[in-house]
Regions:
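Glycine-rich, phosphate-binding/catalytic loops in enzymes
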Residues: 28, 47-49
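Catalytic-core segments of enzymes that bind and process phosphorylated/nucleotide-bearing substrates
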Residues: 32, 45, 69
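Glycine-rich nucleotide phosphate-binding loop and flanking beta-alpha elements
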Residues: 18, 46, 74
Length: 250
């Protein structure tokens, strides 16, 4: 920060104005705490559109986004929404950001995007709302509220920064680096957390990778928190003061 201390950083992607250089990362986040990365995305990969690695780094699941039925978000020009941010406010030190996207199609995640045609896509009527609540050095909360015309499966993906690893428990997920515990992930649902941990997966699809230089992929931990239904809410807290913060639920 300006005083030379370890910085806090949160970015929220709330725009889609052009197909150019666009990944399937609507309402995705990047997160640093105490000057060190916590959440990142898979990065950039060489412009070899048919290559599996390139398809992966552009995908929804390669970002800290909500994946729907294993599909990617549409990047067709007809689906450009401009600015999806409903509000971004600060009350005291606490930041509130909310975005909403109305989706009419989902795109297969295994086809190079320059070869995707309209008939490959999944028609849908989905209203997707994401609320982020951030109190620096204390906690980060992500709440996804999804309404669909039919039952669907939803996965909140969190891709960890290099050097950060996860340990899954029944009620929480511990994130740590080589020196210390960084934070604890807790579900805001009343039922046990329904999460999977992936690192360097190749089959049935790439997951748990990032590219440090645009030419290779390296392994990293990737966490998927799942729910299903027509109307689902997934609430997740990154608790940075895990020894002090009381447990809460939606």
């Amino acid at each position: 920060d300006k005083e030379g201390g370890s910085g806090e950083y949160l970015a929220f992607n709330g725009s889609f104005f052009s197909r150019q250089h666009k990944h399937s990362d609507d309402m995705g986040i990047q997160f640093f705490s105490d000057g060190k990365g916590v959440l990142t995305d898979a990065g950039f990969f060489a412009y070899l559109y048919d290559q599996e690695e390139r398809i992966f780094v552009e995908s929804t699941r390669a970002h800290n986004c909500l994946e729907i039925d294993g599909f990617d978000y549409s990047r067709f020009n007809i689906d450009i929404f401009g600015n999806c941010i409903d509000f971004a406010e600060k009350i005291g030190d606490c930041v509130f950001i909310q975005g909403t996207v109305n989706r009419s199609r989902l795109v297969p995640a295994n086809i190079p995007y320059n070869k995707v045609k309209d008939w490959h896509c999944e028609p849908c009527q989905i209203k997707q709302k994401r609320l982020v609540i951030y109190l620096p050095s204390k906690f980060l909360i992500i709440i996804d509220d999804i309404k669909s015309m039919k039952n669907r499966n939803y996965t909140q993906w969190f891709n960890l920064s290099p050097g950060v690893s996860a340990v899954l428990g029944k009620e929480e997920i511990v994130l740590r680096d080589s020196n210390e515990v960084r934070c604890v992930i807790r579900s805001l649902q009343k039922d046990p957390i329904n999460a999977s941990l992936v690192n360097g997966q190749e089959e049935p699809r790439l997951q748990g990778w990032f590219s440090p230089n645009g030419n290779i992929l390296e392994k990293t931990d990737s966490i998927g928190i799942e729910r299903a239904g027509k109307h689902s809410i997934i609430g997740t807290m990154f608790d940075l003061e895990f020894e002090k913060t009381p447990k809460i639920a939606l």
